[in-house]
């Protein structure tokens, strides 16, 4: 399902009441490139609540640790991907860690970490955007400009705290 909040659209998939996949907030022309769902005319309260939390994460108005406490979610990923995502959850708001740093902790390669992060079903909620390459931003499923925007928003909000 796709929920519209203000000028943004957020794709979400639920299993019962648990969120299992979401997109980052996207403009209307972008949403269908990443998500082939139906825009809900009247989304239920749960969808709106989760959508608003994801929008706050996008604009760095909410810490992901708080969001994970507010959203009932389920990770359906391989055990390796789960280990990578568990490491990513430890990255503090406004900070970044390299693919190599995570790879060392898990005794694997930076490329394997990148592949696991590309399978993150809950972007922003699990902040894979905070993982960067040694000398660049690295990749991001929604494009490098989106990753740059999210990281810049977090830096601005961190300085204002």
Curated annotation (Swiss-Prot):
Any one Gene Ontology BP term: DNA alkylation repair
Listed Pfam families: DNA_binding_1 (PF01035), OGT_N (PF22413)
First-tier enzyme category under EC: transferase
Domain of life, per lineage: Archaea
Reaction catalysis annotation: a 6-O-methyl-2'-deoxyguanosine in DNA + L-cysteinyl-[protein] = S-methyl-L-cysteinyl-[protein] + a 2'-deoxyguanosine in DNA; a 4-O-methyl-thymidine in DNA + L-cysteinyl-[protein] = a thymidine in DNA + S-methyl-L-cysteinyl-[protein]
Keywords tagged on the record: Cytoplasm, DNA damage, DNA repair, Methyltransferase, Transferase
EC number: 2.1.1.63
SUPFAM superfamilies in UniProt: Methylated DNA-protein cysteine methyltransferase, C-terminal domain (SSF46767)
PROSITE patterns: MGMT
A molecular function GO annotation: methylated-DNA-[protein]-cysteine S-methyltransferase activity
Matches recorded under NCBIfam families: ogt
Function description: Involved in the cellular defense against the biological effects of O6-methylguanine (O6-MeG) and O4-methylthymine (O4-MeT) in DNA. Repairs the methylated nucleobase in DNA by stoichiometrically transferring the methyl group to a cysteine residue in the enzyme. This is a suicide reaction: the enzyme is irreversibly inactivated.
Name the record gives this protein: Methylated-DNA--protein-cysteine methyltransferase
